[in-house]
Amino acid sequence: MAVTKEVGSFIEAPAFYGNLSGKENLEIVCKILGLPKSAVMDALELVGLTQYKDRLAKKYSLGMKQRLGLASALIGRPPILILDEPTNGLDPVGIHEIRTLIRSLPQKFDCTVLVSSHLLSEIELMADNIGILNHGRLLFEGSLDELKQRAVSQGYPTDNLEDTFLALIDADNRQRGGER
């Protein structure tokens, strides 16, 4: 249970009890983590779901489910948050709101946030440091500026993270014998 309190996680498609409200789902998380019920309303407010707290989870839109998953990860204010595709299913306004929230978390709650996403344009707007993986191999770890410097030194494009990423992956795949 100690690890559960230290790491909050949000997986791409969070699962909830559909016949319970968003609030009731978070109350279960509170009970498991030994947190006071007051943490539920704080978490719902943080992700913008307060007005939908009594709606059954099965009636939530995909974006609302994403927000509820994020609330579940944040509820205990863990020092480490692992978020997998946190903006999946959100409209542009929701993406902006969640991105802004995620960017604020390290300073607001003194935590480390790890985000996994295939939306590289989002990562570019969200991250201070990035890691690039290919077939389980860490190709790069550092700041976006360091990545751009490395890309320039190797003749890779630097217009955006996606182009740089694709060039790094392509070079690694060619080096490994064309594996994709």
Where are these regions (language model features)?
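Conserved ABC ATPase "signature" region
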Residues: E27, K31, K37-Y52
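Helical segment within the ABC ATPase nucleotide-binding domain
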Residues: H96-F109
